[in-house]
Amino acid sequence: MKYNLRPDERATLELRGLFEKFGYKKYKISKFEEYSLYATNRNFLIGDKVLTFTDLDGRLLAMKPDVTLSVINNTGATREKSEKLYYIENVYRENRENHCFKEINQMGLEYMGRIDRYSILEVLSLIHI
């Protein structure tokens, strides 16, 4: 059976295959994070607006404006133990043209933990393919 994929879907499938060939594992995280993660790391974010809400337990949560901070917050990587992860996630950012939030599909990879020259070259080669 042959499927007609859009160019973005085809690119996503090809990148997934490439990342997995190099040992990267798919990382899936919740749509929500504690707002404090983003408030503490505001300088890391692209914009200064974060879509928030209070959950049923009274905690202030945020719709992810960024994936990297969530991965860092939830990974088991240490200076001795590296993790090679990739993600395909939706993030929520301010649309400055109409002052609304927009949902953006984002794909990326993270090499976390012990970093050496090989790991740097690996990531650079993967993003330049």
Per-region residue spans from a language model:
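TRNA-recognition modules of translation machinery and tRNA-sensing kinases, especially anticodon-binding
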Residues: 1-127
